[in-house]
């Protein structure tokens, strides 16, 4: 046996040496090439301009090679101009100097930010919920993710008519992939095919716009009806992510296609590890072009809480994750009869049989076979169990205890939603006077469709396959907001992205701090918890267009050169807007620590989308024991007609800001029917430094 092991080891070593030699040779041949995104701005207006030919010509000039096979990765030629290619560092520099090239930046890997929730938000199924089904059927949600499972009942085309006439997309899902009148589009950028082999994309797509599917559960847990926010709408899947991550060039390709395809809302449950300057962020660049074409991009805040969110552009709606009134709990029964309650999703029924209880640091002493059988049996204990945990720890040292884990169960309570600990927080690390995240939505223990090609635990030891599963993340919160954005669009097809964003933010449920530190305040939940029903009739909205965002960027000291990096066209700063004076639905200002007293003003303009001859009176509510003084001028707005605009100024003053806690208030405009609420946040530099790339 020992000789056999030695022979096997030698054979493996030989194979490894050969493999490494091939890798070394391949690396030498590549000459340290990596994928760069070459951004060339807006498409030229000349009718005879051929983007791909231009891109190939640029590469041929730089590389001296005639064939671009293995060089050109993608051409962006529908909604903006550019390409991605494999270049050396010296080639990158030469490309950057060529005429027509706006910027060149390396492709980065982005990560995925990985049902009763709709009922919890008030968007219930049936006659009690107002719907515009004819328009909903013409609404298209574009999902940027790991693809989709086309056979899922959540995406069945049964009962749907042909795709909307505005749809210009295609179904290129790969082998054995078929679209239908529900799932009307599929594109793959990963060379894996659009079929979802990770599960993430199927889950998010069904949360946003999946069909109504009754009697769904995860092994009986969370049993009920699974559905999206706009079940009668259409879905287009753009696979930009694989198991290796989500590449910049894929994301930009998806924006290029989705804008041209005719989607109404883009849902992107993904992001980087840290916030990037706007001109270096493919999501910010793509979303800017989408905004200019009337398409709202909704992005997850990230799962790095309490660290800052990676989604920081004001033209993107940034979503934090919160709990609902349903909790899934698991009980551990110790050998002495004591019961510990924890939060996890455990589908196993051990039928009362007890197994050895292993403390974390002792796992290395177990053999592989014993760990294999118990690899999926674990849970996170609640803080209330602290004393029992300490007692159990001492028991583990002295004895060899056993325990059994009971199957999880769903319990309902009426506690307020709380922001999940994993949800990334503010402040905004790029534009410090723009409050992020914007809104909070359910993202904990969400039941939705799943890919049958991967286990629910995503581990190789798990052989289970399910059509629906329960998971958590800001990735799950993001499609809830995407669904609500599409829902609003069905009632107001003519609204700009900023109007939809404003409606969602100003009608949100107020949330209370869950703790006494900064990460428990508006930096956690933004404007509050989303309220879909109120959002379709907000009364007033804060409007923003492309020119407003350009003025905002000018206020961040962007010049004509750097502006072109984002807008994709020659733009000059004819006027600057202080970032805090961007006509944003929330108001935020970072102040110097050196000032003991301060006064800061915010200028805003609202548009009446309610009724004519309405009078709105202002009310200010001071939060968290803050000692702010807030003055609104004028304090009354009289709107004679729909679409009328009126401006006002908010002056905030105070003394000695708490360096560890933001001071905040709420401004509410009310006409007796509508309550248009905007959070006001002032803070100093309490946070630790964050690296910005």
Swiss-Prot record:
Task: Report the subcellular localization.
Answer: Secreted
The answer to keyword Cell wall biogenesis/degradation applying to this record is no
Q: Which GO terms describe its molecular function?
A: serine-type endopeptidase activity
**What's a single GO CC term here?**
extracellular region
PA domain mapped to chain residues: 354-396
Tell me where in this chain the Inhibitor I9 domain is found: 35-113
Keyword annotations of the record: Autocatalytic cleavage, Glycoprotein, Hydrolase, Protease, Secreted, Serine protease, Signal, Zymogen
Q: How is it modified after translation?
A: The C-terminal propeptide is autocleaved.
Active site at which residues?
A: 145 (charge relay system), 200 (charge relay system), 475 (charge relay system)
- Enumerate the InterPro entries for this protein: Peptidase_S8/S53_dom (IPR000209), Peptidase_S8/S53_dom_sf (IPR036852), Peptidase_S8_Ser-AS (IPR023828), Peptidase_S8_subtilisin-rel (IPR015500), Peptidases_S8_3 (IPR034197), S8pro/Inhibitor_I9 (IPR010259), S8pro/Inhibitor_I9_sf (IPR037045), SBT (IPR045051)
What GO biological process term is on the record, naming one? proteolysis
One Pfam family this chain carries?
A: Peptidase_S8
Q: Which residues form the signal peptide?
A: 1-25
The name this protein goes by in its record: Subtilisin-like protease SBT4.10
